[in-house]
Amino acid sequence: KELKRFVGDRDLNSDDPYIPEISKPTGKSVAIIGGGPAGLSASYFLAQKGHDVTIIDAMPKLGGMLRYGIPEYRLPKEILQKEIDLIAKMGVKMQTNTKVGVDLSFEAIKNKYDAVLMTIGAWSSIGLNCKGSDIPGVMGGIDFLEKIAKSKTINLGESVAVVGGGNVAMDACRT
């Protein structure tokens, strides 16, 4: 695992990172709604097959949970951005700050592209279903990590309790 990461990081940091061979253009266009892990992965493979791919995402930067939910210590944003830049070099177009249904209609997307792939993520924290879970200062782990990633100010008070023991809870503790 460490060897794979070393080789991958070294390639991404080189002047000429590996870009897979791109098949001849198919003449088909694909819109991918959502620029998180699934959207980025799909765009990579669709572009490799010769399709004209556009990612449409509501956030200011692509990456979804990779950017806004996983802390820097687990996934350096510089590495993520280099991966996204590589996908752009493959010819994938990236349209950010665009909310489907608000800034751009789904109907317009369907009319413009031959295919549409929806890869919108699951950004919801599982709420505590108990008394007091709705008082000010109580927030879900995913919401907390997203606010930190966006450099939003959070008033944590003098003491904090993290409920849970999974990855999100541990990331919240370490953050």
Language-model segments: which ranges?
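Solvent-exposed alpha-helices and their adjacent loops that cap or buttress functional pockets
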Residues: 22-25, 110-111, 131-132, 152-155
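Glycine-rich FAD pyrophosphate-binding loop
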Residues: 51-67
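Rossmann-like dinucleotide/flavin-binding elements
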Residues: 31-56, 95-106, 110, 124-126, ...
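A short, charged/proline- and glycine-enriched loop
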Residues: 23-30, 138, 156-157
